[in-house]
């Protein structure tokens, strides 16, 4: 189970025990109690997708210890096992794999986020750490979720190991969210800096994770099936913790063990769509021009078994169960929340108002116009309308507090130079939406957090807000509009109520996208 979430001023180092909520203010009591419960639910979601237990449920040895069973497949072990991995959850996955398979493990290389070993040690998570004399070499890199020289060294070491394997060898590949940044190996003559700049430009213009990964794969030696190709003819078992909506194998960490289905024309279409084709470096044009003659063909991945071992849906199911234990009527709306963060925030604001009206039908007329807009917006965001309608009907029948859960990965179009992440920006936008008009005698809280514990280039997982955000920010002379225009949500939440609305978890050792909680509690 993940360490209990802590909420504390962002400029302080997270202590080993939860920090108290700060000065006792009577009118804040109910909000703080709700926030404590929301943090418990977020913590339970993260705890459900810890890497070790998930890997242990997937792998098993026969009584002789000479056969490895993975789902319905069996592999012979003859001290012929090699291991590579990359991602935010891979340290714990590798530790679990080593515990089970150490006698057969010849060599391993993993690429994990900078500082994660120290963070796990500090949190007392010994089960997430490799043994002192492990055969697995650990590289830490990709500081602030960005590929760097350390991650490049790790990727090239992984490539070298894979290319040295034979038909008698077995390669266990561990993949989780964050793996793409931790496995950068640009095709020469493209440099890491050129590839990183192109990715940054695309992200700033609102490119989806699928579009970003299409470009990354086209310019990478290892993504888009490249790692599988490098390991051929060895057998490859790829265990994947999904951080992508719908769990598409070819998208998670840019699909290093899955043949790419995208062509150069797909890449050019994306670059044209975001107005970047004319600005491409000569090296990128060179690689794209010759890519069609040397694709990672489907035939190169027939020796690979890809297995999803965990996802956002598993995390939300556990949060729902815990919410019901706490006395909430809890429902999961979607595990596919995506789209522009402003539209997603508008959806949650409308949902809160419509749900509040359903909870207090005697005090307000049903907001038919807003309910119609809610359904239209759900369609725009590709959310199941039937599921939304069933949730609203359940809210209307509820005789107590309600918790609506969702997961996914909205996108932010960067237009300023501030500091923040999509979870903090979403929370700030939702806070504005909640304050547009009174919600009646109901306390409403919204929380958005990244299950990896790192929201963008910050040291926090996300943030939470209530419907009094606008008035409280005004009382503290904080300008929400300017913060949003400058994409400066982190700075805002650092200053707002002394940083107590930020979610501090530290690196969690896992990653299954984001968790959103909307709590409605009748007063």
UniProtKB/Swiss-Prot annotation:
The modification N6-acetyllysine is found at residue 200. Keywords: Acetylation, ATP-binding, Cytoplasm, Kinase, Nucleotide-binding, Phosphoprotein, Transferase. This is Glycerate kinase. GO terms for cellular component: cytoplasm; cytosol; mitochondrion. It comes from Mus musculus (Mouse). It holds the Pfam family MOFRL. GO terms for molecular function: ATP binding; glycerate kinase activity. Its EC number is 2.7.1.31. It comes from the Eukaryota. It catalyses: (R)-glycerate + ATP = (2R)-3-phosphoglycerate + ADP + H(+). InterPro entries: GK-like_C_sf (IPR037035), GK_N_sf (IPR038614), MOFRL (IPR007835), MOFRL_assoc_dom (IPR025286), MOFRL_protein (IPR039760). It is an enzyme of class 2 (transferase). Expressed in the hippocampus, callus, brain, cerebellum, renal cortex interstitial cells, epithelium of interlobular bile duct and skeletal muscle. One of its GO terms (biological process) is fructose catabolic process. Transmembrane segments: none annotated. Its main location: cytoplasm. It is found in: Cytoplasm.
């Amino acid at each position: 189970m993940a360490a209990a979430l802590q909420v504390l001023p962002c400029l302080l180092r997270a202590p080993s025990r939860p920090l108290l909520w700060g000065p006792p203010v009577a009118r804040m009591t109910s909000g703080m109690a709700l926030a404590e419960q929301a943090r418990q639910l977020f913590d339970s979601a993260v705890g459900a997708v810890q890497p070790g237990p998930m890997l242990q449920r997937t792998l098993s040895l026969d009584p002789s210890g000479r056969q490895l069973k993975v789902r319905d497949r069996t592999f012979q072990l003859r001290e012929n096992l090699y291991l590579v991995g990359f991602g935010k959850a891979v340290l714990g996955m590798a530790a679990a794999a080593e515990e089970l398979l150490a006698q057969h493990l010849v060599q391993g290389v993993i690429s994990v986020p900078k500082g994660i070993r120290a963070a796990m040690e500090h949190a007392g998570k010994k089960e997430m750490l490799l043994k002192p004399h492990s055969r697995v070499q650990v590289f830490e890199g990709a500081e602030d979720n960005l590929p760097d020289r350390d991650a490049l060294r790790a990727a090239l070491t992984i490539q070298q190991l894979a290319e040295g394997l034979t038909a008698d060898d077995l390669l266990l590949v561990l993949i989780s969210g964050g793996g793409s940044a931790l496995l950068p190996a640009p095709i020469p003559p493209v440099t890491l800096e050129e590839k990183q700049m192109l990715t940054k430009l695309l992200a700033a213009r609102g490119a989806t994770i699928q579009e970003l990964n299409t470009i990354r794969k086209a310019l990478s030696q290892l993504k888009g099936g490249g790692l599988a190709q490098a390991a051929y003819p060895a057998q490859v078992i790829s265990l994947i913790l999904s951080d992508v909506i719908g769990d598409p194998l070819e998208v998670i960490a840019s699909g290093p063990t899955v043949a790419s289905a995208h062509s150069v024309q797909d890449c050019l279409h994306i670059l044209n769509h975001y107005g970047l084709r004319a600005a491409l470096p000569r090296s990128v044009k060179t690689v794209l021009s010759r890519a069609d003659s040397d694709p990672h063909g489907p035939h190169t991945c027939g020796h690979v078994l890809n297995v999803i071992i965990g996802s956002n849906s598993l995390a939300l199911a556990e949060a729902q169960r815990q919410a019901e234990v706490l006395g909430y009527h809890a429902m999961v709306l979607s595990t596919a929340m995506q789209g522009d963060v402003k539209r997603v925030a508008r959806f949650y604001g409308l949902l809160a108002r419509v749900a509040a009206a359903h909870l207090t039908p005697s005090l307000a007329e049903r907001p038919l116009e807003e309910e119609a807009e809610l359904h239209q917006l759900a369609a725009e965001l590709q959310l199941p309308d039937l599921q939304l309608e069933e949730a609203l009907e359940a809210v209307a029948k509820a005789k107590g507090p309600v918790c609506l859960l969702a997961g996914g990965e909205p996108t932010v179009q960067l237009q300023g130079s501030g500091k923040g992440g999509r979870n903090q920006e979403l929370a700030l936008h939702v806070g504005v939406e909640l304050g547009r008009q009174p919600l009646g005698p109901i306390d409403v809280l919204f929380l958005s957090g990244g299950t990896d514990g790192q929201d963008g280039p910050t040291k926090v997982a996300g943030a939470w807000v209530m419907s009094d955000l606008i008035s409280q920010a005004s009382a503290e002379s904080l300008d929400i509009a300017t913060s949003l225009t400058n994409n400066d949500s982190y700075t805002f939440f650092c200053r707002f109520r002394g940083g107590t609305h930020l979610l501090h978890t530290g690196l969690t050792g896992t990653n299954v996208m984001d968790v959103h909680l909307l709590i409605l509690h009748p007063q």
